[in-house]
């Protein structure tokens, strides 16, 4: 007699298939994430209040780059393209040779992961969707702020360099280090972020800001 219902069995099969597909998507032949060359930008000297005001006003961007996720005994590397318009976004995650890809699109209260035009999954938050389908999650809601070099709403502890760039942040259980910035127009934006939470370590490289 089976102890798993048909619905539970289908749910387990779906999660297993997604995990296999995304593992194939993300795992590459190398185990290190190449960083961009050191920026030669001339940084803007500002007070933190001025810098925070300028960065918080940025609500639209197109960025691309790569990221790595390290867990005990496992390293995942992938490329990404991130389009943000207000609170709506679309993130494409793909392998280095563009053989596999998934798309995550979101707006307040609804996030969808697309594996193909006919196969998609939804949840109310990106963290919930990733936990359901992948078994782990990244703080995508907070990355909306961290990717710009500012804290997300809520309590935090922070350290700054002499230019008042945010260089270290502790928030929502995560430790974030901002090791490189680049100048884009009149603002300085993060180029490399390193996140850690327990045994999970994430490195995000932004190659191009638009």
Swiss-Prot record:
GO CC terms: cell outer membrane
Cystine bridges: none
Protein origin, superkingdom: Bacteria
Main location: membrane
Cited InterPro entries: LolA/LolB/LppX, OM_lipoprot_LolB
One Pfam family named in its UniProt record: LolB
Keywords: Cell outer membrane, Chaperone, Lipoprotein, Membrane, Palmitate, Protein transport, Signal, Transport
Residues bearing a lipid moiety (N-palmitoyl cysteine): 30
Location(s), subcellular: Cell outer membrane
Entry function: Plays a critical role in the incorporation of lipoproteins in the outer membrane after they are released by the LolA protein.
Name this polypeptide is given: Outer-membrane lipoprotein LolB
